[in-house]
Amino acid sequence: MTLSSSFEISAAGLTAQSERMKVHANNIANTSTPYYVRKIPVVVENTQASFEDIIAEMHQGVLKAGVTYGASGATMAGVMADPTPGKKIYEPGHPQADKHGYVTLSNVNPMTDMADAMSTSRLYEANLAVIGVVKNMANKALEIGRGG
């Protein structure tokens, strides 16, 4: 593994975690939005398997465009819909009520997404730390090469 591939792997991780954070932030922002369905980011190791192969092993969900990255490392392969149904409440005067007077609430659990966002943030920080270490290693190698 070269130093440049270490940078590429960490950059792929930064990109994947950034995209994950956007999904979690969107979920949290829509916690109170009726009919909103929680999105689940799918982050995979960068392999030769297609997203379709990976998702076939998981729950059926909504496939959206995702992030790809040429280096080894993590890739956000896509986003799938959480199949958990939202709670229905009877509110016939609500403008979004169905013909029977029910409104389906969002299926987002804000605590779950906050915990996932914190985990994502820590993974992002870890990738930044790796970049810092690799940068220091490269600088030390240059110093050794200069004879000092």
Residue spans of the language-model regions?
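Amphipathic alpha-helical polymerization modules
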Residues: 1-148
